[in-house]
C-alpha cells in the first residue's frame, strides 16, 4: 500500500505548495500525516477498518472488520428467540458491511455504473435497472445480498432485517466517528503550526 494512496483516500489536508511555504515545501510530510491518522485510530478502530475497506479494498482490514462485526451481531442477537445457523451471522455481517461501504448503492451490473446501456440495435438508452449507475439499497436488494450467503425465504429474512439495520447503523456511526476524530486532529495540528 502506498502512503500517497492512503492519504488521498482520506482527503487529509496538509500539503500546501503555495509561495508562502517556500515554493514546493509541504506543511506536513506524508509521515506526519500518517501520524495524524495513527493518533485517531483509538477513537473508532471499527470506523477506520470500514474506511480502509471502503477506500482501499484492503483484504486484511476486511477480515478484521468481519470479526468485529460478527461480535457485534452476536451481541445484538443475545436475546434472539429461536435458533439460527452460524451462516446467518456471516450473511448479516456481509450484507451490513456491503451496505455501509456502498452507501449510495451497489454499482449496477447491467451498465457497470454508467447509467447507459446499448441495445441490440446499438442505440444508447438509459439503464432501466438503476438510478445514475447505482442500485439503491432497499429491503429487496438487502435480501438478495443476504441470500447469497444464506439462502432463506423472504419471510425468514424479515426476522433478521431488524438486526441487519442495527449493524449497518453501528458501522456507519463508527465510520463517522473515525472521520470526525481525524478532522479534529487535523485542526489541532494546523492550529499548532500556526501558533
Describe the predicted segments one by one.
Residues 138-195:
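Long, charge-rich boundary regions
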Residues 108-111, 127-130:
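Short cysteine-rich clusters marking metal-coordination/redox-active sites
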Residues 93-107, 115-122:
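Short, flexible, mixed-charge glycine/proline-rich loop motifs
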Residues 1-94:
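N-terminal alpha-helical interaction blocks
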Residues 115, 131-136:
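Cys/His-rich microdomains that often coordinate metals
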Residues 2, 23, 102, 174, ...:
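Feature marking protein-protein/ligand interface regions
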Residues 118-123, 137-141:
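Short Cys/His-rich "knuckle" micro-motifs
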Residues 5-8, 51, 75, 91-98, ...:
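Charged/polar, solvent-exposed surface patches and flexible loops
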Amino acid at each position: 500500500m502506498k502512503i500517497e494512496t492512503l492519504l488521498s483516500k482520506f482527503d487529509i489536508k496538509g500539503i500546501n505548495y503555495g509561495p508562502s511555504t517556500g515554493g514546493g515545501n509541504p506543511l506536513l510530510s506524508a509521515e506526519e500525516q500518517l501520524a495524524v491518522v495513527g493518533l485517531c485510530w483509538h477513537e473508532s478502530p471499527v470506523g477506520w477498518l470500514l474506511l480502509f475497506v471502503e477506500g482501499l479494498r484492503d483484504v486484511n482490514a476486511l477480515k478484521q472488520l468481519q470479526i468485529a462485526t460478527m461480535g457485534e451481531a452476536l451481541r445484538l442477537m443475545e436475546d434472539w428467540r429461536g435458533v439460527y445457523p452460524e451462516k446467518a451471522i456471516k450473511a448479516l455481517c456481509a450484507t451490513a458491511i456491503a451496505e455501509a461501504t456502498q452507501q449510495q448503492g451497489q454499482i449496477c451490473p447491467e451498465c457497470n455504473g454508467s447509467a447507459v446501456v446499448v441495445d441490440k440495435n446499438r442505440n444508447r438508452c438509459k439503464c432501466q435497472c438503476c438510478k445514475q449507475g447505482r442500485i439503491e439499497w432497499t429491503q429487496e436488494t438487502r435480501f438478495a445480498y443476504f441470500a447469497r450467503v444464506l439462502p432463506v425465504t423472504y419471510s425468514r429474512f424479515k426476522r433478521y432485517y431488524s438486526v441487519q439495520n442495527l449493524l449497518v447503523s453501528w458501522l456507519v456511526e463508527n465510520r463517522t466517528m473515525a472521520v470526525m476524530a481525524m478532522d479534529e486532529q487535523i485542526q489541532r495540528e494546523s492550529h499548532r503550526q500556526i501558533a
